[in-house]
Amino acid sequence: SDPLGFKDLLASKLGNVYSAVQDFPMQNTMFQPVGGMDQIAKAFEKRVGKNIRYHSEVQTLRQNADGVTVTFKDTLSGKVSSVSADYCLCAIPLSVLRNIDTDFSDKFKQAVKAVAYAPVGKIGLQMKRRFWEEDDHIYGGHVLTDIKGINTISLPSTGWQKKKGVLLGYYHYQNTAIEISALSPAERAEFALDAGQKIFPAYRSSFESAFSVAWHRVQYNLGGWAEWNDKNRATAYPVLIEGEGRVLLAGEHLSYLTGWQAGAIESAWQQIAKIHERASA
């Protein structure tokens, strides 16, 4: 066949595909935990579950020369309790931490407030049959589209040839995420189905159920991930990465791999080393 003309290549927005692999994280070989990404969190729960307090909303964080005290409320009973320790490694997103009553210095509080968080939304669509495999012989991968609000439809990379399947119906950010999140869950599903129907003829007829999330509207997230700019990396990041007193912060927001579990884990290792160093001094 004849090669496409340069004008046609530009019109196809092929550059958007290449731009997705320019960032360092996208250039590396990636693996998925068997059973889904939440298996990493479940593995932590399996190892340290006895130390986890569920339904516990942090109310205050106070420290002195000897230790740190965190006050929290049981969201089921309303009971307020507290726990104290020599050090605190706080993994609460900055978007949430800034609204908690702390005794951080003004400089530290300003650094916490300086970091913006990305509005992000996704929807999972369960299909009663895997039409993309049965009809189109597509196994895994992504469908990149210029349909506003959709961005990417991702097909499952596991469970091939099984009866049902869950695909990612949209993955959007910023203003588009804010607009779509204003819809009800049912309206979000309708929006995703209307768009997907333009690509796959069996999209709507195969639909069974949906689950959507807008992370900027989730109470304990208030955003998909931290969005650093050059200014804040130079001013706020050095303040936050050092922590204050006996409180250190950790999470994807305290790494250069924001939005990734890998960034959160690397951040934790780094901060644990600091606690060990300070406690051993």
Model-found features: residue ranges?
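Core domains of carbohydrate- and sulfate-ester-processing enzymes
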Residues: D2-K13, S95-V96, K231-E242
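A short acidic, glycine-rich active-site loop
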Residues: M30-F31, K109-A114
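Conserved flavin/dinucleotide-binding core of flavoenzymes
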Residues: G67, K73, G78, A91, ...
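Short hydrophobic core segments
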Residues: V58, S82-S95
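Flavin (primarily FAD) binding-site architecture
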Residues: C90-F108
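Active-site/ligand-binding neighborhood in enzyme catalytic cores
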Residues: S1-T60, A65-G67, D74-L76, S84, ...
